[in-house]
Amino acid sequence: MSEFGGLSIALSSLQAQQRALEIAANNVANASTTGYTRQAADMTTLGNATPAIFSTSSGDGDGVQVSAVTRFRDAFLEIQAGFQHGSLASLDQTNGTMTQVQNLFGEPSSTGIGAQISNLWSAFDSVANNPGDAGTRSVLLQQASMLASTINSAAGSLQQLGTSETSQLSALVAQVNTTSASLAKVNQAIQSGSVAGLDVNTLEDQRDTLAQTLAQLTGATIQEGSNNQVTVSLGGLNLVAENQSQSLSLDTSGSSAVLRATQGGFALNVTSGQAGGMLNDINTVLPGYLSKLDGVANTLRDQVNNVMSPISGTIAAGATDQSAAGTLQFGLALDGGASTTVSVAGADWSGAGGAAALQTSLQTALDTAIGAGNATATVTTNGDGSLSVAIAPTGTHALQVQASGANAGFATLLGSTPVGTDGIGGRAFFTGTNASNFAVSALVAGNPSAVAAGVAGNGSLDGSVALELGDMATSNSGADATYSTMIQQLGMDAKDVQTRDNVQQQSVQSLDAARNSQAGVNTDEEMTNMVEYQKAYEASAKFVTTLDSMLDTLINMVGP
């Protein structure tokens, strides 16, 4: 090796050590940068040139070079990270929703639905103890109205949670589409850079970050392909493949929300990621608890109404064709025969003497409708002014009612669960078909005298009906049990999701620790490497100084 060859070797060392120092400095600078992967300089020996014919070579080499910059990344760990983070995001989402549902009901509580149902039975008990007192009846109506309002509010809050999550899911879909398009562009840049022989490590960091984001949002799977590009798949759809991306859309037009591929419109089965958690909340969790709350409301309605106005026989109410205002129109089917429509006009159920007038009109209409049939229908006026309709022989009969105007109250009398109120029959205490429209009947609300405290005909001081309802407080069935079962199920479901969420968090933490141990920056290690590169740089510089001194001596020796 000539002296000038030594200078060339020293120069290559200076350049290589300087490059290694720059890489180490970049690692330290990005130690806290999300998605950054630790890099290191790969140094290789520069082989000496092939000697010419009849010449020799020492074979010592011609120095050093940085042949590549390596990213410390495990592709298998990245794939596992996408899967595990997607599962965690789904559980986090549902766990948060379950917490909101629990907070919504707020049980146990002195003001919750459970306590208010108990207060309702206590209010009935107070009416039973003093049935003639309008004040206790007013308190009962206030308690019933408060309970109905609380049930309505809970139902509305559950529906609002679903609406809110649907809006969030729509925004998430837009984020997925933007991220997919960005990843496709990065894939293209990586391919172009790799072909050109450029350093694409920074682009690969961006690629991995975008791919992990898609996995966390949707539960998509990640697969690395050729030229360091990735393919991201979701439910049979390639969200991203090389430099192409597909967009998603949220479809809420059906009974369930579903994600669809914008191109082709086919539905995607998304069960993981934040989107999977949201879809589970929107389609299953929230509707499930709303249905359970509907069951509580309907059970309470029937529990109270059935006690207030027991009725024998099988008279079922249903709508018929609309009739003119002030006209009662109903159909009567006896012993399986054809239904006959009967109209009673001009009878005002709401006014004084209305029951008697309606009795006459209804009896005449029924007799005409039955004609020569093998059944009879008898309308009688009770001592308290209410009407009774008796159909004989017993069997399955259908009495359909359509009422309007002043006669609207009569429809309740002939309903499937009509009520007696101090002998004034035909008024349901609770109405509604679900938790959203559950309410105190308009015929009772604001009218304490309409509260059925006793059996029709026993007088206004009979409190037997209210007493029976008050005793519901010790019942092991009914609305109390239905609501208690719902709250217990809510607690178990929430605990189950929370437990699975905690276990998944531990799995993700272990996986992330393994990823960070390989790809993360250890500043102590980098500082040690920098000292090593610096010393090597100083040694190379010292070598240059030594060669310079040797050349100077040699030149002076052979000089004039």
PLM feature segments, named:
Residues M1-P560:
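S/T-rich, low-complexity, solvent-exposed segments of bacterial secretion/appendage proteins
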